[in-house]
Amino acid sequence: MNLERVSNEEKLNLCRKYYLGGFAFLPFLWLVNIFWFFREAFLVPAYTEQSQIKGYVWRSAVGFLFWVIVLTSWITIFQIYRPRWGALGDYLSFTIPLGTP
């Protein structure tokens, strides 16, 4: 989609939809929101909807960073402690690696 062909109101509406969609456990939408609207929020000359778009982009960045930290922490903890959790670790695993820990 070419954002230059879209009205400022429609840009704001689309940015808001991607921001709200990220709350449905879809942090990828926040990343898309950041990439698509960063230029509109911070680099183009000012217009009336820009401050709202800027807010959505900032909040999308914070939400995406939060999800990256949470998922990285969980993956690290799970990879390190899964063998110690015994049956629970096996139950949470999609595939169980062969061999000894």
Swiss-Prot record:
InterPro entries of this UniProt entry? Gamma_Secretase_Asp_P_PEN2
Give the UniProt subcellular location, in the record's own words.
Endoplasmic reticulum membrane; Golgi apparatus, Golgi stack membrane; Cell membrane; Membrane
Instruction: List the membrane topology term(s).
Output: Multi-pass membrane protein
- Tissues with expression: Widely expressed. Expressed in leukocytes, lung, placenta, small intestine, liver, kidney, spleen thymus, skeletal muscle, heart and brain.
- Organism expressing this protein natively: Homo sapiens (Human)
What role does this protein play?
Essential subunit of the gamma-secretase complex, an endoprotease complex that catalyzes the intramembrane cleavage of integral membrane proteins such as Notch receptors and APP (amyloid-beta precursor protein). The gamma-secretase complex plays a role in Notch and Wnt signaling cascades and regulation of downstream processes via its role in processing key regulatory proteins, and by regulating cytosolic CTNNB1 levels. PSENEN modulates both endoproteolysis of presenilin and gamma-secretase activity.
Tell me which disease this protein is linked to.
Acne inversa, familial, 2, with or without Dowling-Degos disease: An autosomal dominant form of acne inversa, a chronic relapsing inflammatory disease of the hair follicles characterized by recurrent draining sinuses, painful skin abscesses, and disfiguring scars. Manifestations typically appear after puberty. Some ACNINV2 patients also exhibit reticulate hyperpigmentation consistent with Dowling-Degos disease.
Q: Which residues lie on this side of the membrane: Lumenal?
A: 79-101
Instruction: Tell me what effect the entry lists for residue 93 to N.
Output: Induces a N-linked glycosylation
Give the matching Pfam families: PEN-2 (PF10251)
Repressor among keywords: no
Intramembrane region positions read: 18-36
Outcome recorded upon mutating residue 15 to S: No effect on APP processing by the gamma-secretase complex
Per UniProt, the keywords (alphabetical) are:
Cell membrane, Endoplasmic reticulum, Golgi apparatus, Membrane, Notch signaling pathway, Transmembrane, Transmembrane helix
Q: Looking at the keywords, is Protein biosynthesis present?
A: no
Q: What is this protein called?
A: Gamma-secretase subunit PEN-2
What is a GO molecular function of this protein? endopeptidase activator activity
Give the UniProt family note.
Belongs to the PEN-2 family.
Q: Which cysteines are joined by disulfide bonds?
A: none
Q: Which GO terms describe its biological process?
A: amyloid precursor protein catabolic process; amyloid precursor protein metabolic process; amyloid-beta formation; membrane protein ectodomain proteolysis; membrane protein intracellular domain proteolysis; Notch receptor processing; Notch signaling pathway; positive regulation of endopeptidase activity
Quote the annotated effect of residue 15 to A. Decreased APP processing by the gamma-secretase complex
Effect ascribed to mutating residue 36 to A: Decreased APP processing by the gamma-secretase complex
On subunit structure and binding partners, the annotation says: The functional gamma-secretase complex is composed of at least four polypeptides: a presenilin homodimer (PSEN1 or PSEN2), nicastrin (NCSTN), APH1 (APH1A or APH1B) and PSENEN.
Ranges of the Cytoplasmic topological domain: 1-17, 37-57
